[in-house]
């Protein structure tokens, strides 16, 4: 059983920004796509999980970008499952051009029992013959992301196009929503984005999008009308000169 997915990918127009280079949300979207593909290959894809009454939930994600490939440039993608700790597990991702690392990411997942609406231990979900690689990337403890910024930027209504097969807002749709509150020049400076998914959101729900400046970027949150935080995020940004350099892999 292949415990890693490895493949070439040509950056499409749909994943690029106004500079004709891969966007933050485009990179994360593609990483999620290859995670789903590899899950199918090792027997824990969406349909197989549904037959067992189970569903994958994204708990946290982090992506770091070092250089953004241009539209129609071919890069190499890799993903593999990582450590399992009771109710949580990790998955790792890399994007390279030759030997040059362009981006890396990690996601933390949980498995939901659909009948009981509760998380279950992850280890029994994986096939017993699957050997989990020890290699990790995008290292470092997840940020605590305590507190909620006070300044409201806008309000956002969850739309039908934001939903995934779980009938709630897709994890990458949250990223699109949060990044859409910034001008394009600020998006070009993003070097890291960490996102914590705390409460599911459903079609028609209204979210208050809030943010505040930090020493090296932004803290963001989307808050439900009930006062619950649906998603929290941290952006780390670079200076203008570094941002320009990072667009030339």
Segments the model singles out, each with a brief description of its role:
Residues 18-21, 67, 73, 165-166, ...:
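Short histidine-centered beta-strand/loop micro-motifs
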Residues 53-68, 189-200:
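Small beta-barrel nucleic-acid-binding modules, principally OB-folds
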